[in-house]
């Protein structure tokens, strides 16, 4: 029965999305509406693809495109990369909280770029990392690492 199958698929997509958000977009983790809506859309895409004769692999590929749309590039991951590489004084156990605190601080750098899903592979990505390094250094000089 299609309805029962979709009921089972929704928790899979919600769990998958939640795990991804925890790693790359922790600022979105509390947005239960977003998670439910995106997961539901992915489950519907999967169900529709299977019903239309696509293989399970193809259906998962289509549903993952929906699930991760506009989430491939992560501001948090970019900040985390800079902090991990250039600021060893931020110990591993403090990095997540520190990087979350830096999201609003670094927003001015992010606004200068077109942050598409494939931005990380663009030449501009290195420029962004340089901008972030400067902003983070200035923030630490003014406010410390608390």
Predicted regions and their residues:
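Short, small-residue-biased leader/transition segments that mark boundaries at the very start
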Residues: 1-3
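Acidic, low-complexity proline/glycine-rich segments
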Residues: 5-9
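N-terminal interaction modules that seed assembly of large macromolecular complexes
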Residues: 10-66
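Contiguous interface-forming segments/domains that mediate binding rather than catalysis
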Residues: 16-19, 26, 34, 90-95, ...
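Charged, low-complexity interaction regions
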Residues: 27-29, 53, 91-92, 115-122
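Long, charge-patterned amphipathic interaction tracts in eukaryotic proteins
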Residues: 70-115
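Long, low-complexity acidic/proline-rich regions
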Residues: 96-146
């Amino acid at each position: 029965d299609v309805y029962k199958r979709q009921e089972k698929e929704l928790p899979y997509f919600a769990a998958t999305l939640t795990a991804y958000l925890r790693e790359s977009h922790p600022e979105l983790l509390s947005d239960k509406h977003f998670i439910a809506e995106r997961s539901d859309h992915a489950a519907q895409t999967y169900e529709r693809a299977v019903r239309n004769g696509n293989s399970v692999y193809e259906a998962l590929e289509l549903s993952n495109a929906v699930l991760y749309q506009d989430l491939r590039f992560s501001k948090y991951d970019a900040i985390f990369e800079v902090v991990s590489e250039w600021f060893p004084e931020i110990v591993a156990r403090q990095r997540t909280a520190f990087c979350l605190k830096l999201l609003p601080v670094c927003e001015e750098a992010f606004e200068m770029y077109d942050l598409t899903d494939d931005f990380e592979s663009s030449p501009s990505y290195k420029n962004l990392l340089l901008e972030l390094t400067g902003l983070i250094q200035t923030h630490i000089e003014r406010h410390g690492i608390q």
